[in-house]
From Swiss-Prot, chains A, B:
Its EC number is 2.7.11.33, 2.7.4.28. ADP binds at G152, V153, S154, R155, S156, G157, K158, T159. Transmembrane segments: none annotated. It comes from Methylibium petroleiphilum (strain ATCC BAA-1232 / LMG 22953 / PM1). One of its GO terms (molecular function) is ADP binding. InterPro entries: Kinase-pyrophosphorylase, PSRP. Bifunctional serine/threonine kinase and phosphorylase involved in the regulation of the phosphoenolpyruvate synthase (PEPS) by catalyzing its phosphorylation/dephosphorylation. This is Putative phosphoenolpyruvate synthase regulatory protein. The lineage of its organism: Bacteria, Pseudomonadati, Pseudomonadota, Betaproteobacteria, Burkholderiales. It catalyses: [pyruvate, water dikinase] + ADP = [pyruvate, water dikinase]-phosphate + AMP + H(+); [pyruvate, water dikinase]-phosphate + phosphate + H(+) = [pyruvate, water dikinase] + diphosphate. Belongs to the pyruvate, phosphate/water dikinase regulatory protein family. PSRP subfamily. Keywords: Kinase, Nucleotide-binding, Serine/threonine-protein kinase, Transferase. Pfam families: Kinase-PPPase.
Amino acid sequence: MPNRTVFFVSDGTGITAETFGNSILAQFSAKPRHVRRPFIDTPDKAYQVVREINDTAGREGKRPIVFITLIDTEVRGIIRSAHCLVLDMLGTFVEPLEAEFGIKSNHRVGRFDDISKSQEYTDRIEAINFSLAHDDGQSSKNLDIADVILVGVSRSGKTPTSLYLAMQHGIKAANYPLIPEDFDRGALPSALVPHKKKCFGLTIAPERLREIRHERRPNSKYASLENCRLEVSAAESMMGREGIAWLSSTHKSIEEIATTILRDIRPDRLIY
Amino acid sequence: MPNRTVFFVSDGTGITAETFGNSILAQFSAKPRHVRRPFIDTPDKAYQVVREINDTAGREGKRPIVFITLIDTEVRGIIRSAHCLVLDMLGTFVEPLEAEFGIKSNHRVGRFDDISKSQEYTDRIEAINFSLAHDDGQSSKNLDIADVILVGVSRSGKTPTSLYLAMQHGIKAANYPLIPEDFDRGALPSALVPHKKKCFGLTIAPERLREIRHERRPNSKYASLENCRLEVSAAESMMGREGIAWLSSTHKSIEEIATTILRDIRPDRLIY
């Protein structure tokens, strides 16, 4: 599939079109070229995209694949007239739902009159601020309002996972490192003790941890395989002893880690 | 549409199913209850979900809507046997693509053998670390390797946008505040001058800024409407003078802001 182009054409940001399109394209081994055309909401703009699609088809000798999220019937019709394979996510699924619900759709694509004023959106921004302020044990204040506290050795994946939970799910995710001093003392950091129930552990294969730490501080004791082994094993024992559930981040993406954590903590305010 | 439940059933994290499902549900005014069932990858787990769907149908007197991203034919068939309306995103779109490409699909849903080892994933994690280290002008080091530097007054939306760009698009997004001292001096912070070309501005309506700042520091001069007006107007003049493109975050979601910035900066390494 070389010389093949995929277009994402949307009357909004195109995030939905692209996210969905990518999950479908991930089914195929080849990597086509991506072209994003957001905010296509007038016939004029649509005709411009059609010219681009047709030029591409001529140049590549293969018709492009075009993922669309377009509400306006006229705009949609114009794009359909191009020399391409159109995959229309809304048209295919919204109509059966109208029949099922017995109501007409709003003819909107993931857009709200003013998303920035919705409670859900405000909660997400607040969660991001909370997670930033509570990154890497920076603050023990307000841990009582955290939805989850990720714990684990340095560089086990806590920070990106916390931010992802906040950004995608509006979860107030603090994270707190387990460090050699804690292992020597044989006890959880005292700030965590009252909140043990909402702690969730991340662990990681010592070999992978060594690689990650080595990039940060080459040839340090901190990055040595021996030290990584000791820290990981001490952290796993401690989490086991304290009854803290954990998972390994070694072969998992942030999305997979986050989904597993959500399934486990099932915060009351999410129906999960 | 009260007492109506929507299920998201996936053999992976379910992020794709949910993102797509939500963009479709946003077409309707009512808010059904959401239930997420990720990692459904065996017949046993599928039968459990079927029981849940049927129980819900009985209790609510209406068949649930079920968005699925399931590759395994057996698992898919089991879910289809439940009393519900199934909306199958992969089945509907992957098959025509197989015909178009003339190759069989990988039968995978946005998953890779080991995503954590792909270059794309490593770049994303690196971008998150970069964006965190360069949040709020914390560091002027390595600004030359930033893909974009967001500028604007305090609380104009720079931090969440930077993190989103890093997390979703692997963009190294620094952010740097424009503060009263800069306006008094009438010049950009000196660290930004060599990198003006990759600066992108965020602005915000003074009334909205006042609300946001008021939550942080109630009744401060910082949060007063008069001060917000002065800062916003000074920042907009400065960006105009320096030839820095900007947009207003007032009525936009992070996703919309990020998409607009990407369209504008078109980083070379993304085919955008």
